[in-house]
Amino acid sequence: MEVTPQQVKQRLASGEKLFLIDVREPSEHQTASIKDTQLIPMRTVPANLQQLEAMSDEAPLIVFCHHGVRSLQVVQWLREQGIENCQSMSGGIDRWSYEIDSTVPRY
């Protein structure tokens, strides 16, 4: 259900297509973001279920937030809705900044 930032980086580097889904709020996304991600705030996930389902048919969804709590909740909910091709990035964007890309601001 979870994947580390290092695993995400390796999968992207190998050429695997992934959809990186940021479930933080727009203000958080403005503060710090990862390149080529799609912002779908947690509160809007149910309204975007069909879009997420279509995306998951095309490639795995990697869901992230600030520290990994909200994203894990979203992944659990998506799986309850029948979308299995999704994982939460453990530690969120904060861990990504610490381990992968220090140019991403930490807050």
State where each predicted segment sits.
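Rhodanese-like catalytic fold shared by cysteine-dependent sulfurtransferases
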Residues: 1-18, 26-60, 69-107
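Short, surface-exposed ligand- or partner-binding patches at beta-edge/loop junctions that are enriched
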Residues: 64
